Amino acid sequence: MFLINLLIYIIPILLAVAFLTLIERKVLGYMQLRKGPNVIGPYGILQPFADAVKLFTKEPLRPLTSSISMFIIAPILALTLALTIWTPLPMPHTLIDLNLGLLFILSLSGLSVYSILWSGWASNSKYALIGALRAVAQTISYEVTLAIILLSIMLINGSFTLKNLMITQENMWLIMTAWPLTMMWYISTLAETNRAPFDLTEGESELVSGFNVEYAAGPFAMFFLAEYANIMAMNAMTTILFLGPPLNHNHTYTCTISFMFKTMLLTSAFLWVRASYPRFRYDQLMYLLWKSFLPITLALCLMFISIPIALSSIPPQM
């Protein structure tokens, strides 16, 4: 029974990720005035399955000088963390109803750095290591902004529970009242998931492929799946935090359809950004965070703390 539950949980996420890769290739194709994958199946719809069969049936190669255990553990850890991050998300029902759901997601997104760092270090390649170190610096930096934004949301929400956010946003979505936070959160999630224009870790022109340059076949596919699962999870988080439930939220299916639609819309924006913008320079990436996002998020966090105290003359009841 446990195995069946596990498969029911994992397979839909992996299927969604598979079709997201197809949609991305199609979107990029049409934006560059070409067709994209259109050979395997009608309109290329079976392309992800062909890719999966090809990757998982090839021999997984590894460099002779690599550290075997870390080299193997890194992609497994990446995919495990990417799948685990979905457990506390209310869609509208959660798999695990955690009291500290916001903290759990923040800590898991921070842990994903280790898989990238291990893969870069264990590969024993200078390109992989440079890509991994870039990823660590980038992710840790943007984690600061994400943490402060989540703290601000927690002050509005009154608790760390994600389900409470649905009750908080019954009358008005938080994007209406905290739109600067929404914009900064969305841009920070782009950086957190190493997506264009912040894909410094995978700079093809200078690092060949980045931290996963020495990976092939199955382990490479695991990193690929983890990246796209993280993208969808982050967009699901954006929907929960700022775009709330629909106005008629008494019906579970209405909530679920609305949640799926908004997550798909945000994910499509990720693809649009990738097709439209060039890569940031590394100093611009850090300047954006430390000189722009950090002061603004701190100021907004202080505002959310001070307004209830100023208006009620007493500390808010948490």
UniProtKB/Swiss-Prot annotation:
Catalytic activity field: a ubiquinone + NADH + 5 H(+)(in) = a ubiquinol + NAD(+) + 4 H(+)(out)
Molecular-function GO term, any one: NADH dehydrogenase (ubiquinone) activity
Enzyme class, UniProt record, top EC level: translocase
Primary residence: mitochondrion
Reported function: Core subunit of the mitochondrial membrane respiratory chain NADH dehydrogenase (Complex I) that is believed to belong to the minimal assembly required for catalysis. Complex I functions in the transfer of electrons from NADH to the respiratory chain. The immediate electron acceptor for the enzyme is believed to be ubiquinone.
Protein name: NADH-ubiquinone oxidoreductase chain 1
Keywords carried by this UniProt record: Electron transport, Membrane, Mitochondrion, Mitochondrion inner membrane, NAD, Respiratory chain, Translocase, Transmembrane, Transmembrane helix, Transport, Ubiquinone
Subcellular location: Mitochondrion inner membrane
One Gene Ontology cellular component: respiratory chain complex I
InterPro entries with a match to the protein in the record: NADH_UbQ_OxRdtase_su1/FPO, NADH_UbQ_OxRdtase_su1_CS
HAMAP family attached to this UniProt entry: NDH1_NuoH (MF_01350)
Gene Ontology terms: biological process: aerobic respiration
Pfam family, one: NADHdh
Positions of transmembrane segments: 3-23, 68-88, 100-120, 136-156, 172-192, 223-243, 253-273, 294-314
Domain of life assignment: Eukaryota
Phylogenetic classification of the source organism: Eukaryota, Metazoa, Chordata, Craniata, Vertebrata
Membrane topology designation: Multi-pass membrane protein
Family that this chain belongs to: Belongs to the complex I subunit 1 family.
EC number(s) per entry: 7.1.1.2
